[in-house]
Amino acid sequence: MPDTPHAADFARQAHKAGKTVMVHMPMDPATGPFAWRPDMPASELLGRLQAALRAVPYAAGLNNHEGSRMTSQPEAMALLMNELQQHGMFFVDSRTSAATVAAAKAQSIGLASLSRDVFLDDTRTVEAIAGQLEKAIALAHKQGTVVIIGHPYPQTLEVLERELPRLKAKGVEWIPVRQMIGERGNRATAAHGK
């Protein structure tokens, strides 16, 4: 997230380690100096996006943090996708709302994009997170791929540290986001995991 104290340092470290850096962009109802809100003019939205990109060096892509109100705004999402395309970036729709038009706007201009299938940690218990990971594994077997979103909560990290080494035995390969975009051919999976 661009407004966190160590965003730039973490982005540099991730880039140095060969990881894909993404901006986790705050969107309404999220607040803060970078957050996009429906009442803002395009110039303000673009200014906040540019500031966020400066705050997170090496960003190759962007996804929405919260954004249930913002991602349902067609004009703002078209503006965002056009700007990301000009920067050669990709977009991952966190799908915080069933009314989102973000992925559709990305796809309409051919912007590399994905949509989330499973949230790992809406409920922050080890048991619930492990259950969501099992749901994701089942979905991956059913539809071929699955996009998972989680947070660096201690419970999430505990589950991932325990379970990631076991994925291959379960017939699942953990792949980078750019590879997933290639696997899905820039098309959203039917019903986005529902």
What are these regions (language model features)?
Residues 1-194:
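Catalytic-site microenvironment of enzymes
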